[in-house]
Curated annotation (Swiss-Prot):
Protein name as catalogued: Antigenic protein NP1
InterPro entries, sorted: PA14/GLEYA (IPR037524), Peptidase_M60_dom (IPR031161), TCAF (IPR051244)
All copies of domain Peptidase M60, residue ranges: 1-288
Coiled coil: none
Domain PA14: 463-615
PANTHER family: EXPERIMENTAL AUTOIMMUNE PROSTATITIS ANTIGEN 2-RELATED, SI:CH211-210B2.2-RELATED
Any Pfam family the entry gives: Peptidase_M60
Membrane-traversing stretches: none
Species, as recorded: Entamoeba histolytica
Amino acid sequence: VQVSIGKCNHNPSDQWLDNISRWSNDRMPIDSIGIDLGLQTTQPYSINDTFKIGSPIGGMIYLRFDTTFTNSFYVTFYNVGRASIINYNITMNEEWNSVLKNAPGNVAEIRTPGNRLVFTSRHIRNLEDAQYISDYWLKAISISNYAVTLENIPITLNFDQRVDAGAAVAFVDRWFTQHPSDWASGCVNKEGLINSGNWGPLHEMNHHMQGPYLRGGNWGIKEPGEETNNVMTSINYILYTNIAGHRNQGLSGWNYVSDGYSTIYKILNGENDQPHLRSYVNIAHAFGTDTLIALVKSYYGLWYENNYEGEYSIKRDSTSAFCLLAAIATKRDTRYLCSLFKYDIQQNVSEAIKNMNYPTYYPFFNVYAMSYNGNYYGRTYKIPYGTTRLNFTATTAIDPSATSVSYTIKSGLTKGKLEQVEENVYDYTPNFGADENDTFVLNIDCIVNGEKVHIEQDGTFELDPHQVEYEVYKDVKTKDMEQALNTIQNKTSNYTGTSTFFDIGNYDDGTMQSMLVEKGKLIVPTSGYYTLFMKADDLGRLLLNVNGEYEQLLNVKTYLGGYSKTINGTYATVKLEKDTEYPFILYNLNTGGQGFIRIGYCYQGTDQSSVNVSKCSVLDIGSSMILNEKVKAGAKEPEF
């Protein structure tokens, strides 16, 4: 019997990264300290055997014993300190916030049935909703536990500063994974998990379905080891995040899996971008995550029960296997779907799918929508406070060869002004508030391969309070800011644009001088002193209303491509209060060619004497810190 203290239940000699022997309070303690109790399993145990153990690094306590020893025994630990540990369904928010989150020690844990996260406690000190976080990680592991009914292995996620992003790895036979330390904060960030997800840790965690204890744990097309995890992680993104709720800003990286349109439009446009994952995930958007899980289960159940490999002479990781199992799970003819992905289907498999007599599945999606023929897969769509041009032709992922294409607004959009501009194109101006929405039903009709296709999609519009508007005044014919301000007085702008940051993004005016004016409100997450910075091409000015009237805060007089801590006028420090809205006006004068303007910030704390601009790490002000000027004071957008 051995007791180990530290970050996991392995000795240093068992670790794969054992070439660094130092540690500090800024990182995880190096591996574990093992304490041999000197007992042999052949000897009888006395209830009075007592041992003193301890460690300068603190951490969790683990018992290890020879697996040949099968008799039961009991161990009691005394004088164990309280630590920053969150136990699922045990640790309540009241106890967490009053005692546990500030408990001593530099190691913290989240424990749920099936997984465990271990990292430096500094990552968890600001967490408030411990119950949400433990519930999230239980749900995360439960997806694959349910989808794969064979032996699933409990997994520990370790976050260590020695591990680079490219070195994140899962050791399933050791029941643990290694992650970069900077991934840890995202695992306990409630807002981040909801709005951005956390692909890396989820991916490594889902390796627990594979390994020497799980024969046949790999499945999928050609890359079974990775496909397994990516499909499971995609289900998490669809079910438990609001990533798709921000698709009006575009979805980058892996985030496309959260939305039906974003998953399929590249394939329909002929792009060969991650086709294997997209071929699985689009099924969840059309038929539900339960159907996709049923498809996964069929790789374990139906595949072996019916001996499909012997019956059809196909391999489990072949495209023919996918097309066959997908047809069974969806009760649809998947031959058209597989043709979109350029998948080969063996002739006998193609005939088998045809003989099932299922209707053909056509994966066509509109970006505004959140349902497919009654299956609600998505999220509401954010629109700005002003007029939105709804172009259903441009925003629908559909077969380019489809004919007789029509888009019909069957019902809805009654809480705003809807004006038809041309066929399938409308201008929609909402007249509801930030805490309301407007719904619609869209019919998509077309002909593909001689077959009539009808798809009904529901959608919901919500206002995006964090999307600000700016006006563009063209041909101001001056390179002087004061003259430009005089020129645009009492004039109507040529057109308007929107931004989701405290900026006006890159644009090109050619040889023309133009003036851009953006209005909104600034909000900050924490009270204290903020140093604001400006960079602009070419000239910029910021007016901020802090004390009841607008005052000029920043002024860039010539092109400035990066934030400066030394040029007067390009930075200023102000004291701002949390949950207070500060109106602003941002001016950008472009003297021709490329143009942009952006505001950054550095939080300096609550003590004015500690303000030090030279030590600032400047960050761009993002969407969470700005509001549209039309947002009513105190209005709250619907919670996810």
